[in-house]
From Swiss-Prot:
GO terms for biological process: bicellular tight junction assembly; cell adhesion. Plays a major role in tight junction-specific obliteration of the intercellular space, through calcium-independent cell-adhesion activity. This is Claudin-24. It comes from the Eukaryota. It comes from Homo sapiens (Human). The keyword Transit peptide does not apply.
Length: 220
């Protein structure tokens, strides 16, 4: 029963990490980190991502333009690019390492401790990937709120608001964190049954000489 529960925990943790990694990649390239709705022209909406700005018009559709210079971007967008790339890389490494630590993958009975360490390392990498995804998303959201409520900006000036990519990034980061927690919990729970099994084998070995001689065990 414990083995089935541990295997299920490993599978769910790996799937959550995979889901968070995929959503993190989508968040990185989705041009909807910020949305701007013009009151004067409701048929035209602006969106901004880490790589480009887009205008959506009912007659023309979506037209996007890449940013000309990386150094000309605001600080939060420059750092967000780096952190999102780092999150994607850490997430991929976490999935790769965790996959080799699963119980369903047989790499030898003598390497149980190695698999446990791989599972723990994969969980830590998923944690790091989730944190590095949450930081840029939360930073951009914080700057958006600050600019929205800035009293120095006149009321008639349009304000940027939260885009869909921010919510997707939050969900991706939480999925990676939860997946890493499950992987580490599964790795920690896999150590106790193993030690208990070694104790049972050792106890049987101490009783075997008495059974072969036909004498009673003095511990009974």
């Amino acid at each position: 029963m414990a083995l089935i529960f541990r295997t299920a925990m490993q599978s769910v943790g790996l799937l959550l990490s995979l889901l968070g990694w995929i959503l993190s990649i989508i968040t990185t390239y989705l041009p909807h980190w910020k949305n701007l709705n013009l009151d004067l022209n409701e048929m035209e909406n602006w969106t901004m991502g880490l790589w480009q700005t887009c205008v959506i018009q009912e007659e023309v559709g979506m037209q996007c333009k890449d940013f000309d210079s990386f150094l000309a971007l605001p600080a939060e967008l420059r750092v967000s690019r780096i952190l999102m790339f780092l999150s994607n890389g850490l997430g991929f490494l976490g999935l790769l390492v965790s996959g080799f630590g699963l119980d369903c993958l047989r790499i030898g009975e003598s390497q149980r401790d190695l698999k446990r360490r791989l599972l723990i390392l994969g969980g830590i990498l998923s944690w790091a990937s989730g944190i590095t995804a949450l930081v840029p998303v939360s930073w951009v959201a914080h700057k958006t709120v600050q600019e929205f409520w800035d009293e120095n900006v006149p009321d008639f000036v349009p304000r940027w608001e939260f885009g869909e990519a921010l919510f997707l990034g939050w969900f991706a980061g939480l999925s990676l964190l939860l997946g890493g927690c499950l992987l580490n919990c599964a790795a920690c729970s896999s150590h106790a049954p193993l030690a208990l099994g070694h104790y049972a084998v050792a106890q049987m070995q101490t009783q075997c000489p008495y059974l072969e001689d036909g004498t009673a065990d003095p511990q009974v």
